[in-house]
Regions:
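Active-site helix of classical SDR
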Residues: 115, 151
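Conserved glycine-rich Rossmann-like NAD(P)H-binding loop of the short-chain dehydrogenase/reductase
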Residues: 27-43
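Conserved glycine-rich cofactor-binding loop
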Residues: 13-14
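Rossmann-fold cofactor-recognition segment
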Residues: 48-63
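Conserved NAD(P)H cofactor-binding loop of Rossmann-fold oxidoreductase domains
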Residues: 83-88
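Substrate-binding pocket helix/loop in short-chain dehydrogenase/reductase
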Residues: 91-92, 99-104
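Residue(s) in the substrate-gating loop at a strand-loop-helix junction
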Residues: 135
């Protein structure tokens, strides 16, 4: 299925990102795995069957997102999967503002930046796939994880809006 195709996965060192890497490698995709935890990426690379490139970078920095894009833009990527993210637990009034701003940088700004950069390339060649991993939290709100709920709502609404725009243009980017 994915023979000859290449996917870039952020947050690939654990959770959904790691599982997506395993699944896509089994489907024949070559992968670029991106995360902060290099050791975990190296361990994952050993178990995968296809060509794997590891990029150890913290995408909470917009500069690092731009640098990541510049590093891989000529590699003919077919699929972008934005999985990097984290949550903060506690009453909004009690949680750390610094941690919340880090959450916004990772869960929102990195997704927004990478989607914008790769989408331009995908639209230009009229093919490509972007999967922005949100959460059921994106559909609701609740106590003790207000920043996480809000960040996943942003990802959901951004992705839906882009999808509508692409559909209206009869684009082959999904």
């Amino acid at each position: 299925m994915g023979d000859g195709m290449k996917a870039l996965i952020t947050g690939a060192s654990s959770g959904i990102g790691r599982d997506m890497a395993r699944y896509l490698s089994n489907q024949g995709y070559d992968l670029i795995l991106v995360a902060r935890r290099k050791t975990r990426l190296q361990e994952l690379k050993k178990e995968l069957k296809t060509n794997i490139e590891i990029i150890n970078i913290d995408i909470s920095s917009t500069f690092n997102c731009m640098d990541l894009y510049k590093t891989v833009k000529d590699e003919d990527i077919d699929v972008l999967i934005n999985c990097a993210g984290f949550g903060i637990y506690g009453n909004f009034n009690d949680t750390s503002l610094d941690k919340e701003l880090d959450l916004i940088d990772t869960n929102i700004k990195a997704v927004h930046t990478l989607t914008k950069l790769f989408l331009k390339d995908f639209v230009k060649k009229d093919e490509g796939y972007i999967l922005n991993v949100s959460s059921s939290a994106g559909f609701m709100s609740g106590p003790l994880m207000s920043s996480y709920y809000a960040s996943k709502g942003y990802v959901l609404k951004l992705t839906e809006a882009i999808s509508y725009e692409l559909k209206k243009e009869c684009s082959n980017v999904y």
